[in-house]
Amino acid sequence: MDDVNSIVLAAGQAAEEGGTNNFLVPNGTFFFVLAIFLVVLAVIGTFVVPPILKVLRERDAMVAKTLADNKKSAEQFAAAQADYEKAMAEARVQASSYRDNARAEGRKVVEDARAHAEQEVASTLQQANEQLKRERDAVELDLRANVGAMSATLANRIVGVDVTTPAAAG
C-alpha cells in the first residue's frame, strides 16, 4: 500500500512541476482507482453474488415447483370434475328409473283401486237389483192377493153398491 501512495504522490508532484495535464493519458490515480475497483469487484463477486444467486435459484425452483403443483392440482380437479359429472349422470339415470318405477306402481295402484271400486259398484248394483226384484215380487204377490178386495172396495166407492155380497155376484 505504501508503494501506491508513493506513486500517487509522485504523480501529483510531477503534475505540479510542470508536467502536462492531459486527462487522456493515464496517470497514477487511474491505476490506483482501477486497483480499488478490481478489489471491490472481487469482494462483491466472492461474497455478495453467490448468496444472491443461491436465493434466486431457490426462488426459481420454488416457482417451478409451484407451477408443477398448480398443473397437478388442475389435472386432479379436472379428473374430480369428470368423476363428479359421471356420478351425477348415473344418479340422474337412477333417479329417472326410480321415478318411472314409482309412476308405474302408482298407475298400478290406481288401476287396482279403480278395478276394486268397479267390482264393489257392480256387486252393490247386483245386490240392489236382487233386492228390488224381491221387493217387486213381494209387492206383486201382495197385489195379486189383494186385487179382488181392492177392486171390490174401489167398485163400492165408485158405484156405491156393495159388490162383495153373493147377490151382487149372481
From Swiss-Prot:
Compartments where found: Cell membrane
Location, primary (coarse class): membrane
CC per GO annotation: plasma membrane; proton-transporting ATP synthase complex
Signal peptide: none
Transmembrane segments: 30-50
Keyword Transmembrane helix tagged: yes
GO molecular function: proton-transporting ATP synthase activity, rotational mechanism; proton-transporting ATPase activity, rotational mechanism
Quaternary data: F-type ATPases have 2 components, F(1) - the catalytic core - and F(0) - the membrane proton channel. F(1) has five subunits: alpha(3), beta(3), gamma(1), delta(1), epsilon(1). F(0) has three main subunits: a(1), b(2) and c(10-14). The alpha and beta chains form an alternating ring which encloses part of the gamma chain. F(1) is attached to F(0) by a central stalk formed by the gamma and epsilon chains, while a peripheral stalk is formed by the delta and b chains.
The protein's name: ATP synthase subunit b
Organism: Mycobacterium marinum (strain ATCC BAA-535 / M)
